[in-house]
Structures are given as C-alpha cells and as structure tokens.
Design a protein with these regions (language model features):
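Substrate-binding/active-site groove segments that recognize
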Residues: 129-150, 162-164, 169, 193-196
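Solvent-exposed, acidic/flexible segments
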Residues: 80, 84-95, 104-107, 126-134, ...
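An acidic, Gly/Ser/Thr/Pro-rich helix-cap/linker signature
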Residues: 4-5, 13-106
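LysM (lysin motif) carbohydrate-binding repeats in extracellular/periplasmic proteins that recognize
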Residues: 260-289
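Short, functionally critical alpha-helical segments immediately adjacent to catalytic or ligand/cofactor-binding
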Residues: 107-122, 182-188, 275-278
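Extracellular LysM carbohydrate-binding repeats and other cell-envelope/extracellular binding modules
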Residues: 278-308
Length: 308
C-alpha cells in the first residue's frame, strides 16, 4: 500500500499539469498501477451474521431486504476505519456510564448502540439542531425534562440525557409494542410513525415503508452492535491498551451560583478543560443559579489525568 501511495502521489501532479497535453496517463495506465508486483489492495464485503437481535427482538434475516439493509450498514461502518476505531476507544470510557442508567431504567443494554448511532459517543450537533449524546431537539428535550438555556444544556449531560432517552423509548414501547419500532420513532417521531401505521396497517419496523434515514436507522444500531461485539471478525484489532479507560471521577453537588468555573476547577485541583470534558452540559464560564437548583458536577480525581 505504501508503494502504491507514493506512486500515485508522484503521478497525480503530472496528470494535473499535463491535462491539456498529449502526455497524460490513460485510465488503463492509472489502473495498471494496482496490478504491479508487490501491490495489494483488496476491499471485501463484511460478513453477515447468521443470527442477529436488537433489545431482545430477533432480526428477521430470512428476508432478503432485511439482509441487504443490514449488510449496507455493516459495509458503510466498517469502511469508516478511523471513525470506528475512535468510537470503540470511546466506548471503553463511556459504555459503563450509559449502561448503568439503562439498567436502572429497565432498558436493554443494546440501546447503548442507539446512542452510538446517534452521536458516535461525542457531544454532537446535527444540521437540524439536534444536540448531545442522544441528539435531542430542544422541544423534545424540554418535554422529557432536560434544562436548556445559555448556561446549561442537559442534552450534553450523560446521565440526564440517557434518562430522558429512556423515558422516550419506554413511552414509545408502551404505544407500539416493539423496541425496534420504538427506536425508529426516536428518529422520526411518534406522530410520523402513527401516520404510517394508519395508512400501511403495519406495526413492525421490518415491514414498514419508511423514509430512507429512518429505514436505515435501527439497522445502523444493529450493525454497530454486531461489529463492536466482535471487532476482529470485521478486521479491527484493538489491543486492551488501545481502549480508553474510564476516568476516576468524584461527584460534587452544587446548589449555588458559580462566578467562574475555572475558579471552581482550581478549588478541586483540576482545570476548566477537565471539568468541561466530563460536564459538557456547562455552556458558559459561569452559572447563575438563582433558584438554587442542585447540579451534579463530575470532577476528575486528583491523579486521574496522569493515569497510564
């Protein structure tokens, strides 16, 4: 691969500079670079599992359209090499935080992979304005009890946003009777699922015709589960030392105003960067807590940053 890389890098300037002349490389000559001795470049389809499930519900792989949908997501995700490696590293640090809340709320641990599909375990913002680890729109976030203002955005709070997502999913499950359709509604909204049930007379995610994004959505979570449960089967060889370790954190409860978060950090033998890393819900350099609300701030232990 290295030899091919440097050969192409050398040839590309010639192609660009001589584009209007007679000495340009033909398509056949360019593609023949891959056939030289010692050069190997293979892209193969990822393996499709014989069985799959999500949240305890079997994926009907006996249907060709279901197999093809899952294979599409497996193929897409496994070829995001760097992104997927980083997600698997982050999972070592944050999976426990998410699964603890899922267990407390009575939800299947597979919903961790829905969080992966939503945000790649990062404090993301979508073009549509959905934010945080679970990608809530502001209106839905407030409906499920999350605080959003110029100083606090609990969509970026691991625990609170996960609990809000659990509330939504349990409400949707009570309405639809399957976790996969509840998960689909998390992407498109219950009103849109209701419309499709009305005119399709279908209450099964795998049988329902849906917009492309939602049609792919649950399959994406299933694909993440499949790959991350057995990464070596998909060509990803991470050593134990490659995975990010959970950071030892202490809980500090704040029911007062904070004039400057950096001063707060210094009092706890850390800095604002470390405070923000584990409390992305902090959206300002201060907190006007005039109603004395009780916030939980995660503070790294004194020697946590130096851990090996």
């Amino acid at each position: 691969m290295r030899r091919l890389f440097f050969t192409i890098c050398f040839c590309l300037p010639l192609i660009v500079c001589c584009g209007n002349g007679t000495d340009t490389l033909s398509s056949a000559q360019i593609f023949s670079l891959e056939e030289r001795e010692g050069v190997e470049q293979r892209i193969v389809m990822p393996p499709l599992p014989q069985k799959a499930s999500f949240a305890g519900e079997e994926v009907p792989l006996q249907y060709f359209d279901v197999r093809e949908s899952l294979l599409r997501e497996l193929t897409t995700i496994t070829h995001w090499h760097g992104s997927l490696m980083y997600i698997m590293q982050l999972a070592g640090r944050y999976r426990g935080m998410v699964e603890k809340v899922l267990e407390e709320e009575g939800l299947h641990p597979d919903f961790f992979y829905l969080c992966v599909a939503e945000s790649s375990l990062q404090p993301a913002t979508s073009p549509a304005g959905a934010k945080g680890y679970w990608q809530f729109l502001a209106s839905t976030a407030k409906e499920f009890g999350l605080e959003i203002n110029s100083q606090v955005d609990e969509r970026f709070n691991w625990e609170k946003s996960t609990r809000a997502a659990c509330k939504y999913l349990k409400k949707a499950y009570e309405k639809y009777g399957t976790w996969t359709l509840a998960a689909a509604s998390y992407n498109i909204g219950m009103a849109n699922i209701d419309d499709r049930i009305g005119y399709q007379n279908i209450r099964n995610y795998y049988d329902m015709q849906l917009p492309l994004e939602t049609a792919r959505y649950v399959f994406r979570a299933i694909a993440f589960k499949t790959i991350m449960s057995n990464p070596r089967a998909y060509g990803f060889y991470l050593k134990k030392s490659d995975i990010f370790k959970p950071i030892e954190l202490k809980e500090v409860f704040v029911d007062y105003s904070i004039a400057n978060w950096s001063d707060f950090a210094a009092k706890h033998n850390t800095n604002f960067k470390m405070i923000k890393m584990f409390n992305e819900w902090i959206r300002s350099n201060h907190l006007d807590n005039k109603y004395k609300k009780r916030y939980k701030v995660l503070v790294p232990a004194e020697d946590a940053r130096s851990m090996q």
